[in-house]
Swiss-Prot record:
Organism lineage string: Bacteria, Pseudomonadati, Pseudomonadota, Gammaproteobacteria, Alteromonadales
Gene: deoA
Entry superkingdom: Bacteria
Organism: Shewanella sediminis (strain HAW-EB3)
Family indicated by similarity: Belongs to the thymidine/pyrimidine-nucleoside phosphorylase family.
Protein name per its UniProtKB record: Thymidine phosphorylase
NCBIfam families with a match to the protein in the record: PRK05820.1 (NF004490), T_phosphoryl (TIGR02643), Y_phosphoryl (TIGR02644)
Cellular component terms per the entry's GO annotation: cytosol
Length: 443
């Protein structure tokens, strides 16, 4: 028998906790036998004194096991259960293409996603822009769509990882969100509860990233790779660039449109293509579908070019209650803003830097993101045709188009976009889309 206060005391004194102590505390978080004050105290003790790798693995697996852990064996699937998770960014629409692409190559992708908060967009919010799409189906429908389409992208259900829900809300209110150990456990407990064989982790770097510096992003990527592999799920983390908007747009309906254009081949933003291919190729290799990056890329390009990935995206949407002809008639179903107008820079030159976080917040001020949890969204608003770093900016070339509902909202977003996109005299050096891969062998 353990006492919560003795576990807190140990961590306060910078001692390592045993697996059994961590399991006891997490059970207490779930069944309310540990108080909010005790949870806050442990969070602060971990924030200051950290956890070693064994503690992180124990915390992650205990939280994973605090609720239902999905098991796919009864479905007799003929491929691996694979997924990807991103730390979040602006214009990060990767999941919408990557899930169908991986499924078209023979994987099964039960993707449990989140909503946007702060400056980052949420995958579920994008799907909410599609009429009829159920982001919270019952378990039977979720499993049916995963089996039949190969991919289903839905929200977290109440029976998955209840310990994280309670722990995270307390961390959010007590300034302990930024602990690498606690971030690792929060992310991975949710992902691993989906019963995955393999995971590709997209850790963003730059002005639109969750972590403030490259070093912090790399530390998180290393922690996630070590803990996930330690918990029995093959995982690689990629450090990817978020110093500019990833797609050509940011918002909800506008990003769904770009995802459909990508899958059908109407338009593929080169930066978005590189990061999507990098993550998806890693998933195929970890899942044993491809034995090399070259083979994985060849398979992925084939399912893009022959339309199979687009067809699977359509099958997932109709399977979860959306329109059966969504791919063919995307424009009929997605909402559109009253005002769609260009923004011009005040000077000419080159797009030299971007405050990506501020661009994400501009979408929030338009109504496309949340100021606080539970806020209703306007799915039609956002930014499109956002310039890329290095683009030449002239007096008649817009730096972006704003989709707004009112003149006031347009004016506010216009000022924010002009401030966030810096125009300089010299063309900036090109940054890589993917800085590095962190595999288990690199640790």
């Amino acid at each position: 028998m353990f006492l919560a206060q003795e576990i807190i005391r140990k961590k306060r004194n910078a001692e390592a906790l045993s697996k059994e102590e961590i399991q006891f505390f997490v059970k207490g978080i779930t069944d309310n036998t540990v108080s909010e004050g005790q949870i806050a105290a442990l969070g602060m003790a971990v924030y200051f004194n950290d956890m070693n790798m064994d503690e992180r693995i124990a915390l992650t697996t205990s939280m994973r096991d605090s609720g239902t852990v999905l098991n796919w064996k009864s479905l007799d699937l003929d491929g691996p259960i694979i997924d990807k998770h991103s730390t979040g960014g602006v214009g990060d629409v990767i999941s919408l293409m990557l899930g169908p692409m991986a499924a078209a190559c023979g994987g099964y992708v039960p993707m449990i996603s989140g909503r946007g908060l702060g400056h980052t967009g949420g995958t579920l919010d994008k799907f909410d822009a599609i009429p009829g799409y159920q982001t919270e189906p019952d378990s039977a429908l979720f499993r049916k769509v995963v089996k039949e389409a190969g991919v289903a992208i839905i929200g977290q259900t109440g029976d998955l990882v209840p310990a994280d829900k309670r722990f995270y809300s307390i961390r959010d209110n007590t300034a302990t969100v930024e602990s690498i150990s606690l971030i690792t456990a929060s992310i991975l407990s949710k992902k691993l509860a989906a019963g995955l064989d393999a995971l590709a982790m997209d850790v963003k770097v730059g002005s639109g990233a969750f972590m403030p510096t490259y070093e912090a992003s790399e530390e998180l990527a290393r922690s996630i790779t070590a803990v996930a592999n330690g918990a029995g799920t093959k995982t690689t983390a990629l450090l990817t660039d978020m110093n500019q908007v990833l797609a050509s747009c940011a918002g909800n309906a506008v990003e769904v449109k770009e995802a459909v254009d990508f899958l059908t081949g109407a338009y593929r933003n080169p930066r978005l293509y590189e990061v999507t291919m990098g993550l998806c190729a890693e998933m195929l290799q970890l899942g044993g579908i491809a034995s090399s990056e070259a083979e994985a890329r060849e398979k992925l390009n084939r399912v893009l070019d022959n339309g199979k990935a687009a067809e699977i995206f359509g099958r997932m949407i109709s399977g979860l209650g959306g329109p059966a002809d969504f791919i063919e008639n995307t424009g009929l179903y997605l909402p559109e803003s009253k005002i769609i107008r260009p923004v011009y820079a005040d000077q000419t030159g080159f797009a030299s830097a971007m405050d990506t976080r501020e661009l994400g917040l501009a979408v929030v001020t338009l109504g496309g993101g949340r100021r606080k949890p539970g806020d209703a969204l306007d799915y039609s608003v956002g930014l499109t045709k956002v310039c890329a770093l290095g683009d030449e900016i002239s007096a008649d070339k817009p730096i972006a188009f704003i989709h707004a509902q009112t003149e006031n909202a347009f004016a506010e977003a216009e000022a924010a976009v002009k401030k966030a996109i810096h125009v300089g005299e010299t063309k900036p050096e090109k940054t890589p889309e993917i800085y590095r891969y962190i595999r288990e062998s690199d640790l």
